[in-house]
Amino acid sequence: MNTLVLKIDAILSKHLKKQLASYTISSQNTYVAFAAKKNGVTVLLYKSGKLVLQGNGANALAQELNLPVAKTVFEASNNSQDIPIIGSDEVGNGSYFGGIAVVASFVDPKDHSFLKKLGVDDSKKLSDKTIQQIAPLLEKQIPHQSLLLSPKKYNELVGKSKPYNAISIKVALHNQAIFLLLQKGIQPKQIVIDAFTSQSNYEKHLKKEKNHFPNPLTFQEKAESHYLAVAVSSIIARNLFLDNLDQLGQDLGYQLPSGAGSASDKVASQLLAAYGMSSLEYSAKLHFANTHKAQALLTK
């Protein structure tokens, strides 16, 4: 996916809206004055005058619309690493036990050598042991914002008749992590989120959040493989999640597994037998199917 960002004046804005009048779409982002989608390219015109085109055909559409691409456009391809970037990622959403860790990190091109020496560019190949060794080094060197939503708080917020669902809670966490990082004076050229939902769905849930920022977002699947900033966030978040999982286990006197497989069912049933439902409310995400499976194991 390519992202083109440029500044346009009132005359060009009016011309753009006229050209894309039959392609308009809704946007829940309060900073967006006009939104459209044509040929698979999303067009967002912000109230500030900033125009963003996102999609593989962004360049072609910009030319079709006679936009001043050559002079004022900034282009970021999937593997663009020569600009300062904020990358955001989360860990723990697929695990029954443990909370959700979300981290936003700011990586400048001058950090690349340091990160590659640590093996950050191959973050998916790193073992948990290695992650626990290098995460403290990243936390010390790279500006970042970490958030951890405990299982207990997660269960208070997520579920039927509660404020959030499994997607909207991640939107809230990513948005808050990025917002808080920007408050530190960070000035990225691009903000990338490891995509867990569509941009339109993200913006729908974002509407109810208190804090907002005008910077456009890039959504990329498996973003940690394309952006060092996202890889850094993935590593720090994984370490934060593992620390939380270990602490919860120590509190209960059980080794809590990561993931949502049969091992989680077994440990959950043991916790139910030992302490009752309150132990799962404290350590696990109750709306997962593992809860019912654990209860069923007790009846056998």
Swiss-Prot record:
What does the cofactor field's note say?
Manganese or magnesium. Binds 1 divalent metal ion per monomer in the absence of substrate. May bind a second metal ion after substrate binding.
Q: Which Gene3D superfamilies match?
A: Ribonuclease H-like superfamily/Ribonuclease H, TATA-Binding Protein
What would be an example GO MF term here? Answer: magnesium ion binding
Q: Name one Pfam family in it.
A: DUF3378
E.C. code: 3.1.26.4
Q: Which reaction does it catalyse?
A: Endonucleolytic cleavage to 5'-phosphomonoester
Q: Where in the cell is it found?
A: Cytoplasm
Q: Which GO terms describe its biological process?
A: DNA replication, removal of RNA primer; mismatch repair
The Swiss-Prot or TrEMBL record lists the needed cofactor(s) as: Mn(2+); Mg(2+)
Q: Which domain of life is it from?
A: Bacteria
- Any idea where the RNase H type-2 domain is? 83-300
Keyword annotations from UniProtKB, A to Z: Cytoplasm, Endonuclease, Hydrolase, Magnesium, Metal-binding, Nuclease
GO CC, one annotated term:
ribonuclease H2 complex
Q: Where does a divalent metal cation bind?
A: D89, E90, D194
Assigned protein family: Belongs to the RNase HII family. RnhC subfamily.
Q: What does this protein do?
A: Endonuclease that specifically degrades the RNA of RNA-DNA hybrids.
Specify the protein name: Ribonuclease HIII
